[in-house]
């Protein structure tokens, strides 16, 4: 999926022997766990923390060199066995073959004409690696006792993958042998390659991903060495950081949600063969047939014999593609950047604005998005900005006015402005805010384009620079679009143009008719971000912006990254760190050198 590099392939069996002390590794992983469990540093300190964590990880990797297990041969040597295994177990394998598409890596190539919407690929449940199959495997005993595994299906799948890879008789070995040995996610970037992402929005999630992965590895290293329920896992003698990085990357780039067998809920799964398909723009064409209990995929478009068969991964931004899938997608029609906005509690009209927003189903503080295509904002962001810029009289009209309900319904519709003055204010604000965000970058669009043309860069460095270039291009488009809208509504106000009238309430009017094909997008709910200082209009216009896009100091981070599952691993890690502090020597004594 996406461009995949491969230096060597992973194999079940024993790795090379290295003279490394288990006690020394436990001490290093305990130190890593403690470091990764510290609170998120303030603005400008994240890079320093990243370097410190990376230094510890590299120490561990150096000690573990030669311990990882490998398969013989190349990845594509195992493709015939994958097809044979899939065929024998009820998957469709006719009409396509696995082929190498150079920059995009391996993918599926049509061997006959395939019509749009034709069912061409299906994979039965028994071929899938799922959280349920993990619970029924050798991992089940530890799963039943570990809160992290129970709460985080992606980590469960990663360990399921590692355990099955270490079993030469695993049912899934024909699939596992064909997985890449390395990925192009930022977990595999060199330090100088990550440097290119500094000052971008994406860097915060890159730091978070690296820190979380290191914390999880350190936590589970101790669990595997000391927990009674982990004694039967085939990982005790060889569980390296590189192994864990490979497993979480395999899951991160491939996991999908499918329904459980009874259809009552969803679970995470790895889908062999289907996950060979690369991405293009389009619509989701994969579903799950509960009656036949299989994953099914219909063709996104007509494919001629010899053409690559693409699928659509979803409406992901390029930041999401780079961080979670390891590739940058040119001409991504769903690309976007985040913009954190909130109504300040010190605003004298806060209570009224909060009530209007609540009636519209919009939080008073959230992460919204600026899009790469016109219009740059969703209906939800338009509604928020209108309320954000309302005066007292306009707020009263939306709360107790004669047509209050109608006005709430049309908040997100571009055809029905609140007033010309309100429209001028909101576009002026958006123009200023996007301009502020542009100032946080150390290079310009022209600088990045020139750098890409004149330097011989690694694939990772190219990806990083394209990502920061893309962020700036979206912000520049937003500035131009907002300026054009501001000028238009200023003229409407100067000309005394009448406001458009509406007749009756219609919930459909909440959608922005200019972008009726796009649902409002909120990238993160209020509960998912830390408590933040919100902005008044005048504060946003005049605020200084720091390197990583902070406005008004450390309490105005617009790209907070914290999820419930991350909090859980951190909570568990803190507990383990305390254990490590209190009984480090006792714990290491349990592992004989």
Curated annotation (Swiss-Prot):
The keyword Cytoplasm applies. Keywords: Actin-binding, Cytoplasm, Methyltransferase, S-adenosyl-L-methionine, Transferase. InterPro entries: Rubisco_LSMT_subst-bd, Rubisco_LSMT_subst-bd_sf, SET_dom, SET_dom_sf, SETD3, SETD3_SET, SETD3_SETD6_MTase. It catalyses: L-histidyl-[protein] + S-adenosyl-L-methionine = N(tele)-methyl-L-histidyl-[protein] + S-adenosyl-L-homocysteine + H(+). GO terms for cellular component: cytoplasm. Its EC number is 2.1.1.85. This is Actin-histidine N-methyltransferase. It comes from Gallus gallus. The lineage of its organism: Eukaryota, Metazoa, Chordata, Craniata, Vertebrata.
């Amino acid at each position: 999926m996406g461009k995949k590099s491969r230096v060597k392939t992973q194999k079940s069996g024993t790795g090379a022997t290295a003279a490394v002390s288990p006690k020394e590794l436990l001490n290093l992983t305990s130190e890593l766990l403690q470091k990764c469990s510290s609170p998120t540093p303030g603005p400008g300190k994240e890079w320093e923390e990243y370097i410190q964590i990376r230094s510890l990880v590299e120490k561990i990797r150096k000690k573990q060199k030669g311990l990882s297990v490998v398969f013989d041969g190349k990845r594509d040597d195992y493709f015939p066995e994958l097809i044979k295994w899939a065929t024998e177990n009820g998957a469709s394998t006719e009409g396509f073959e696995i082929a190498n598409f150079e920059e995009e890596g391996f993918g599926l190539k049509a061997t006959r004409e395939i019509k749009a919407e034709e069912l061409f690929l299906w994979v039965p449940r028994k071929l899938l690696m799922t959280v349920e199959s993990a619970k029924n495997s050798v991992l089940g005993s530890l799963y039943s006792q570990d809160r992290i595994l129970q709460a985080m299906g992606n980590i469960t799948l990663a360990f399921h993958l590692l355990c099955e890879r270490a079993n030469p008789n695993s049912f899934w070995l024909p699939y596992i042998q064909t997985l890449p040995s390395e990925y192009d996610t930022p977990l595999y970037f060199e330090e100088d390659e990550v440097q290119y992402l500094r000052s971008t929005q994406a860097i915060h999630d890159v730091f978070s991903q690296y820190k979380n992965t290191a914390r999880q590895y350190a936590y589970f290293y101790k669990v595997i060495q000391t927990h009674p329920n982990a004694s039967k896992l085939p990982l005790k003698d060889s569980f390296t950081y590189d192994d864990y990085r490979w497993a979480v990357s395999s899951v991160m780039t491939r996991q999908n949600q499918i329904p459980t067998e009874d259809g009552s809920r969803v679970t995470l799964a790895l889908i062999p063969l289907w996950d060979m398909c690369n991405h293009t723009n389009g619509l989701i064409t994969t579903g799950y047939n509960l009656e036949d209990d299989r994953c099914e995929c219909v063709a996104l478009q007509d494919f001629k014999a010899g053409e690559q068969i693409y699928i659509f991964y979803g409406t992901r931004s390029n930041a999401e593609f780079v961080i979670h899938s390891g590739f940058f997608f040119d001409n991504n029609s769903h690309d976007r950047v985040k913009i954190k906005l909130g109504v300040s509690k010190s605003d004298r009209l806060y209570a009224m604005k909060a009530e209007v927003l609540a009636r519209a189903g919009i939080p008073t503080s959230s992460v919204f998005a600026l899009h790469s295509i016109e219009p740059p904002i969703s209906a939800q962001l338009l509604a928020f900005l209108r309320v954000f810029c309302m005066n007292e009289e306009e707020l009263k009209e939306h709360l107790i006015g004669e047509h209050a309900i109608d006005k709430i319904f049309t908040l997100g519709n571009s055809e029905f402005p609140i007033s010309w003055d309100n429209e001028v204010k909101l576009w002026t604000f958006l123009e200023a805010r996007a301009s502020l965000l542009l100032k946080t970058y150390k290079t310009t669009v022209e600088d990045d384009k020139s750098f890409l043309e004149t330097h011989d860069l690694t694939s990772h460095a190219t990806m990083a620079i394209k990502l920061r270039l893309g962020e700036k291009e979206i912000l520049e488009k937003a500035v131009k679009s907002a300026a054009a809208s501001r000028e238009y509504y200023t003229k409407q106000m100067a000309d005394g143009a009448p406001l458009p009238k509406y007749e009756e309430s219609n919930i459909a009017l909440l959608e922005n008719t200019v972008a009726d094909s796009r649902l409002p997008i909120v990238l993160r709910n209020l509960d998912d971000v830390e408590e933040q200082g919100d902005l008044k209009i005048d504060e946003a216009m005049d605020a200084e912006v720091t390197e990583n896009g902070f406005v008004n100091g450390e309490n105005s981070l617009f790209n907070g990254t914290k999820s419930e599952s991350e909090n859980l691993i951190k909570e568990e890690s803190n507990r383990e760190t305390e254990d490590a502090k209190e009984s480090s020597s006792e714990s290491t004594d349990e592992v004989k050198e």
